[in-house]
Amino acid sequence: MKYGIVLFPSKKLQDLANSYRKRYDPSYSLIPPHLTLRASFECAEEKADQLVSHLRNIAKESHPLVLKMTKYSSFAPVNNVIYIKAEPTEELKTLNEKLYTGVLAGEQEYNFVPHVTVGQNLSDDEHSDVLGQLKMQEVSHEEIVDRFHLLYQLENGSWTVYETFLLGRGE
């Protein structure tokens, strides 16, 4: 089964992201706006209990964190993804690193760049045009996030919550 680990931001930030995702993100209908803490991975269903136990322990030893969104940016020229950048705080980086330990041990494919995607799979021209417009807009959003979510992918490609973990409590 394919899993992923994410933070879901507040409705206010999700609404902002969705105002662009509706038009510029083909994954709009498959998953709500989110910040990926650990890239998707495969795990046998019979190991799900081990996975959940490990994530509970990580949540228990972690604390709620500040999510501060600072600007629009892009992964171009590597790929044409436009996103709202989150400040990479120590707490966020530490949580990301913990999600590559124990039963989740493995190498990260990319450096951790905390963000919420607003557009992807854009042509070069569309990417340049949309990013140019967004960079003229100011982003100043801050919130406290007190949970992360283990998601799994359904057969139709959409993602749904398997379990939610409260930071500082492990529940």
UniProtKB/Swiss-Prot annotation:
Annotated motif HXTX 2, positions: 115-118
GO molecular function: hydrolase activity, acting on ester bonds
EC number: 3.1.-.-
UniProt enzyme class: hydrolase
Keyword line: Hydrolase
Pfam family, one: 2_5_RNA_ligase2
Motif (HXTX 1) on chain: 34-37
Recorded superkingdom: Bacteria
Active site as annotated: 34 (proton donor), 115 (proton acceptor)
Residues in coiled coil: none
InterPro entries: 2H_phosphoesterase_YjcG-like, Cyclic_Pdiesterase, YjcG
Subunit structure: Homodimer.
Protein family: Belongs to the 2H phosphoesterase superfamily. YjcG family.
Classification via NCBIfam families: PRK13679.1 (NF010223)
Protein known as: Putative phosphoesterase YjcG
Organism: Bacillus subtilis (strain 168)
Lineage of the species this protein comes from: Bacteria, Bacillati, Bacillota, Bacilli, Bacillales
Gene: yjcG
